[in-house]
Amino acid sequence: MIKMRKLTREIKIGNKKIGGNNPILVQSMTNTDTHDVEKTVEQIKRLEEEGCDIIRVAVPDEKAAYSIKEIKKHINIPLVADIHFDYRLAIKSIENGADKIRINPGNIGREENIKKVVEAAKERGIPIRIGVNAGSLEKEILNKYGGITPEAVVESALKSVRLLEKLGFYDIVISLKTSNVPLTIEAYKLASSKVDYPLHLGITEAGTLESGTIKSAIGIGTLLYMGIGDTIRVSLTGDPVHEVRVGRQILRALGLLKEGVEVISCPTCGRTKIDVIKLATEVERRTSHIKKPLKVAVMGCVVNGPGEAKEADIGIAGGDREGVIFKKGKIYKIVKEEHLLEELLKEIEKMVKEE
């Protein structure tokens, strides 16, 4: 059984709350030029449609910080400003409406710089994420531990956390990202045992859609199974829409997301008479807008379905130029192969409308 989630401090980010008993939220990051407000808003809107809960944007300069105000006018989810090197960009982002600031303790600079960011965040009532990245750990910490270790990553985070606490600031979120899955898992486990601040989970530089999905599913999924984590981001090279889809699938696979259609399908074999791959892909695409929790099966033959997919709410199983639609393991109707997809989608829509 999945372990009971650790109760962390509740923190408000724009119109969302994280930590405490709040749902685990899916975050992504735009890969547009933040200066280009139109393209950035367009991408965020697409991510919102996919179920993205929080969005982060890069703020490499003042122009990007000023763009936040205009971007915020057109989106519905909280916006996080991603800050590196220049603390003044954090302050400008806060002034222009950012709902949260992410800073990297390894490159933000001196204590007085962080103090100025904290003062601005306090004034606006927004949280700060201490986003540790293994690639930019402080030299003294690397020397102390002889390289990148879970203890080194956590110490870097806690060093900044203690500074924020000393300044009377407690609206803190922590992330501890490395590209090494076991190391990341151990770092989050260690941090979870030491603090009660919300943890943002992710594997940094995870890779392309296939390899990145696997690494993220193992890393994020393992931690969530242990009851650790309050927000997640699946870092993938490519369209960030995939990050949201994979993130939501991870939550759904663990029973932590109780909305949307889950499509299950057989791996196919020599008995298969229908194009399972095409059908399953199309069902997934055309049901992605549905919020009602449903499990839909696409099975290649009557051996795998309906019997082996009887836990599905509805499904199809292929035959010779025809197939069956089944509900909860019982055959509902026989349909010609060319009509299988449309008939299945009609039945799904009926189920969505049912109370």
From Swiss-Prot:
<protein>
    <recommendedName>
        <fullName>4-hydroxy-3-methylbut-2-en-1-yl diphosphate synthase (flavodoxin)</fullName>
        <ecNumber>1.17.7.3</ecNumber>
    </recommendedName>
</protein>
<feature type="binding site">
    <location>
        <position position="301"/>
    </location>
    <ligand>
        <name>[4Fe-4S] cluster</name>
    </ligand>
</feature>
<keyword id="KW-0411">Iron-sulfur</keyword>
<dbReference type="InterPro" id="IPR016425">
    <property type="entry name" value="IspG_bac"/>
</dbReference>
<keyword id="KW-0004">4Fe-4S</keyword>
<dbReference type="InterPro" id="IPR045854">
    <property type="entry name" value="NO2/SO3_Rdtase_4Fe4S_sf"/>
</dbReference>
<dbReference type="InterPro" id="IPR011005">
    <property type="entry name" value="Dihydropteroate_synth-like_sf"/>
</dbReference>
<feature type="binding site">
    <location>
        <position position="269"/>
    </location>
    <ligand>
        <name>[4Fe-4S] cluster</name>
    </ligand>
</feature>
<dbReference type="Pfam" id="PF04551">
    <property type="entry name" value="GcpE"/>
</dbReference>
<feature type="binding site">
    <location>
        <position position="266"/>
    </location>
    <ligand>
        <name>[4Fe-4S] cluster</name>
    </ligand>
</feature>
<dbReference type="GO" id="GO:0016114">
    <property type="term" value="P:terpenoid biosynthetic process"/>
</dbReference>
<feature type="binding site">
    <location>
        <position position="308"/>
    </location>
    <ligand>
        <name>[4Fe-4S] cluster</name>
    </ligand>
</feature>
<dbReference type="GO" id="GO:0019288">
    <property type="term" value="P:isopentenyl diphosphate biosynthetic process, methylerythritol 4-phosphate pathway"/>
</dbReference>
<keyword id="KW-0560">Oxidoreductase</keyword>
<keyword id="KW-0408">Iron</keyword>
<dbReference type="GO" id="GO:0005506">
    <property type="term" value="F:iron ion binding"/>
</dbReference>
<dbReference type="GO" id="GO:0046429">
    <property type="term" value="F:4-hydroxy-3-methylbut-2-en-1-yl diphosphate synthase activity (ferredoxin)"/>
</dbReference>
<keyword id="KW-0414">Isoprene biosynthesis</keyword>
<comment type="pathway">
    <text>Isoprenoid biosynthesis; isopentenyl diphosphate biosynthesis via DXP pathway; isopentenyl diphosphate from 1-deoxy-D-xylulose 5-phosphate: step 5/6.</text>
</comment>
<dbReference type="InterPro" id="IPR004588">
    <property type="entry name" value="IspG_bac-typ"/>
</dbReference>
<comment type="similarity">
    <text>Belongs to the IspG family.</text>
</comment>
<comment type="function">
    <text>Converts 2C-methyl-D-erythritol 2,4-cyclodiphosphate (ME-2,4cPP) into 1-hydroxy-2-methyl-2-(E)-butenyl 4-diphosphate.</text>
</comment>
<dbReference type="GO" id="GO:0141197">
    <property type="term" value="F:4-hydroxy-3-methylbut-2-enyl-diphosphate synthase activity (flavodoxin)"/>
</dbReference>
<dbReference type="GO" id="GO:0051539">
    <property type="term" value="F:4 iron, 4 sulfur cluster binding"/>
</dbReference>
<keyword id="KW-0479">Metal-binding</keyword>
